[in-house]
Amino acid sequence: KKYDLSLSPDLPLVIMSARIAFEKGFNLVLEILEHLVRYNIQMIIMGDGDKNYISQIVKISKKYPGKLVWVPFSQKDETSLYAGGDLLVLPSNTEPCGLNQLKAMRYGCIPIAHSIGGLKDTITNFDFNNREGNGFVFTNYSALSFYGAIMRAREYYKNKTLWNKLVSQAMRLSYSWDLPATRYVRLFKTAIKLRQEAASENGQK
C-alpha cells in the first residue's frame, strides 16, 4: 500500500535494492523489465545512482502503474521491503561480497543471483528433488539467463507448499562466524596435540 502497488497473491513481489549502476546488472534488468512487469511479477526497485537508468525505470513504471515502482534508497525502508518481498534480484556482474542476500534471506525473501563472487559463495540453486538450496542462480551473464532464473522462481512460487519449504530453509541459514570459529579452534587444538605427540616421540619438550 505504501508504494501504491496493486498486490496480487498470484504474482511474486520482486525487490531490487542496490546502487543503480552497470556493475549491479541494471543493463540486464532494463532488457527484460517491461516484459516482466507486464506478465509475470510486481517489482519495487530501490536505489540511487545512474540517472539514465533511473529515467528508464520511471518511464516503464508509468506505463504499468501498480506493477512497478522506483524509490530512492532508504535504509529504514529497505528492511521492510525484505520483510514484505518474495524475491530479491541480484544480477551483478561483479560482487566481491554482498550482504543484501543475507539480510533478505533472514526475512524470507529468496535471492535470484548471478553466480559470481560472494553471491556464488552464499546462494545455491534450490533443487526440486532433494529440497536443498536457498535461492536461484544463473551462470551466464545475459538477459536471457537472468529471465530464465526469474521464471524458475516464478514457477516454484505457484507451489505454496514447496515455496514455504524454501523460505523456511533460507531463514534458518546462519552465516555468522560462530560455526567457522568453532571449527578453527578444534583444528588448532588438534594441530597442537599432534605436534606435542610428535615432540614427545622425539624426546623433545
What are the residue ranges of the model-derived segments?
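A conserved mid-protein helix/loop that constitutes part of the nucleotide-sugar donor-binding site
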Residues: A21-E34
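Catalytic binding pocket for nucleotide-activated donors in carbohydrate/polymer assembly enzymes
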Residues: A83-V167, M171-R172
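Conserved donor-binding loops in enzymes that form glycosidic bonds
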Residues: M16-A21, D48, P72, N140
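Conserved donor-binding/catalytic core segment of Leloir-type glycosyltransferases
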Residues: S6-K24
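C-terminal alpha-helical cap of glycosyltransferases
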Residues: W177-K205
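A short helix/loop element that forms part of the nucleotide-sugar donor recognition site in Leloir-type
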Residues: K1-D4
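Nucleotide-activated donor-binding/catalytic signature segment of Leloir-type glycosyltransferases, i.e.
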Residues: N40, I44-G47, K51-S80
